[in-house]
A protein has these predicted regions:
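Cell-envelope/extracellular polymer assembly enzymes that use nucleotide-activated donors
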Residues: 2-4, 175
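Short hydrophobic beta-strand elements that form part
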Residues: 4-8, 31, 54
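Short, well-formed alpha-helical segments that are part of the catalytic scaffolds
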Residues: 6-25
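Donor nucleotide-sugar binding loop of glycosyltransferases
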Residues: 12-15, 37, 90
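A conserved acidic beta->alpha catalytic loop
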Residues: 34-42, 87
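Acceptor/aglycone-binding surface of glycosyltransferases and processive sugar-polymer synthases
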Residues: 53, 57-74, 79, 91-170, ...
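Hydrophobic helical membrane-anchoring modules
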Residues: 142, 167-293
Length: 293
């Protein structure tokens, strides 16, 4: 069974040597995608025997993941793991994450930072952001996950062949899960521990969080338009009709129109109608696209 570990990296010359040296124990091949680094990440990786994919410029985390997926497919990997280069993931957890794939229990195994309550404490702002994003993601998949944004994952050969990531940003984590769920691939989580010693993140937390949330909403709304737009549309339509009926009742009794009540009613009806139309149109488009795949 061929196990491949893919590592997206951006200016990680301080960490990459130690990670590659220790990952070799668990992998038949290691792929490093250098996403436009201006340090020695590529050179160090090549010297240590890793297969290096080098982007000419920084394209984003999703672009790096996509390049790693393509190379792992080319290598005909039986198990493909993604592992961050920032030093947060523990290399000794690789067998834990890959085990469900090796034993053919699931197609996508996610290393969750929230299943092990004894794991080191995550910064509160990250914990809140990840939980919000995970709740949004769970609207579009069958499984109820605790950590949809973990970059420590393992994929079966089937998942590797059938999933093609397209998002070039941090939204790729959500995109992969939604595509896996739509393809009826089995997804499960396993507990991992994470190191939060020092500031290992290379992203501004506000812009990073906003980008991920917007990407998550985008993929959720596209893949489940009836749920995402249809349910709010029905709610607004019902509220609007109640207020319109109330306006009519008041007018019948007093011959007066209460402006605030009528505006709320009309506005809610219009908004509800727009959301329902959007849901139907998007659902039709998605259905046609899926039927042609």
């Amino acid at each position: 069974m061929k196990i491949t570990v893919g590592i997206p990296a951006y200016n990680e010359e301080k960490n990459i040597a130690g990670i590659i040296s220790r990952v070799k124990k668990y992998a038949d091949s290691i792929i490093v995608c250098d996403d436009g680094s201006n340090d020695l990440t590529s050179e160090i990786s090549e010297q240590l025997g890793a297969i290096v994919i080098k982007h000419s410029k920084n394209k984003g985390y999703g672009a790096a993941i996509n390049s790693l997926f393509l190379k792992a497919k080319e290598l005909e990997s039986d198990v493909f793991l993604t592992f961050d280069a920032d030093g947060q993931h523990r290399i000794e957890d690789i067998p834990v994450v890959s085990d469900p794939i090796i034993k053919n229990r699931v197609d996508v195994a996610i290393g969750s930072r929230f299943l092990d309550t004894k794991s080191e404490e995550m910064p509160n702002y990250r914990k809140v952001g990840i939980k919000i994003i995970t709740k949004i993601t769970n609207l579009s998949i069958k499984e109820k996950l605790t950590d949809s944004q973990s970059g420590f994952r393992a994929y079966s050969k089937k998942a590797l062949q059938e999933i093609t990531p397209s998002d070039e940003g941090m939204g790729v984590s959500t995109e992969i899960l939604i595509k896996a769920s739509n393809l009826e691939l089995k997804i499960a989580e396993v507990p991992i521990k994470v190191n939060y010693d020092g500031d290992t993140s290379t992203h501004d937390p506000v812009s990073h969080g906003t980008s991920v949330i917007l990407s998550t909403i985008k993929f959720t709304s596209i893949h489940n338009p009836l749920k995402f737009y249809g349910i709010p549309g029905i709610i607004f339509l019902i509220i609007g009709l109640i207020f319109v009926a109330w306006t009519i009742q008041i007018y019948a009794e007093t011959q007066e129109i209460i402006t605030n009540v009528s505006l709320i009613g009309i506005g809610s009806v219009v908004l509800g109608t727009i959301l329902l139309i959007t849901a139907v149109i998007l659902f039709s488009i998605v259905t046609v696209v899926n039927s042609k795949k």
